[in-house]
A protein has these predicted regions:
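Catalytic phosphate/metal-binding cores of nucleic-acid and nucleotide-processing enzymes, i.e., regions
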Residues: 169
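Nucleotide phosphate-binding site architecture
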Residues: 156
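Short, small/polar-rich loop/turn modules that mediate ligand/substrate recognition or access, typified
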Residues: 151
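Conserved beta-strand/loop subsegment of P-loop NTPase cores
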Residues: 147-148
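Cytochrome P450
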Residues: 159-163
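Extreme N-terminal "head/tail" segments of very large remodeling/mechanoenzyme assemblies
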Residues: 1-131, 135, 141-143
Length: 170
């Protein structure tokens, strides 16, 4: 999988739309580095949320991903485009959140997902998008987390993993 573009709107610390164009880099291998609090994990959370509807941590839940700084009108979503086996995929997910509706009552914005391959919509069903992504990537969310990033303090988990577990990942 080669990342192409990542768009985050009202996601994590970002109140409005933030876009990262990975295609402008010459390499298909990336190192995302920076000081603590710089937003590295947010990038991986956005990728993981787009692909699997889950974050990279067992601590953060999808419902907590909407930015506290976003206006009520700003839609919360993540869109991730990537190349896989020569085909361009684009997956988009909305972040579930609560808001005050026109009647002044608390409502919940349900999560949504859509998947396009080569510009053609393949699915707009959460379950179908999840199944297709997992099937095509050959990874579930846990395996994705282990191969895409090593979270702070979790390096030893990878080093100490049993050979069988490592073989499943790689």
């Amino acid at each position: 999988m080669t990342p192409l573009r990542l768009s985050m709107s009202a996601f994590g610390p970002y109140a409005s739309l933030v876009e990262i164009d990975f295609s402008r880099f010459d390499s298909s291998l990336f190192l995302i580095a920076g000081p603590t609090g710089a937003g590295k994990t947010t990038i991986f959370d956005a990728m993981s949320f787009a692909l699997f509807g889950e974050t990279t941590s067992d601590v953060r839940e999808a419902g907590s991903l909407r930015s506290d700084f976003a206006t009520e009108e700003t839609k919360s979503f993540v869109e991730f485009s990537f190349l896989l086996r020569g085909k361009e995929y684009r997956v988009r997910r909305s972040v579930p959140y609560e808001y005050v509706n026109r009647n002044g009552k608390l409502s919940r914005k349900a999560p949504e997902a859509s998947l396009e391959i080569e510009g053609k919509t393949v699915s707009s069903s959460l379950t179908e998008v999840n199944d297709k992504i997992q099937k095509d990537l050959g990874l579930d969310s846990s395996q994705f987390r282990m191969t895409m990033m090593i979270a702070q303090g979790r390096f030893m988990d990878l080093v100490q993993a049993k050979t069988k577990d490592r073989l499943e990942i790689f």
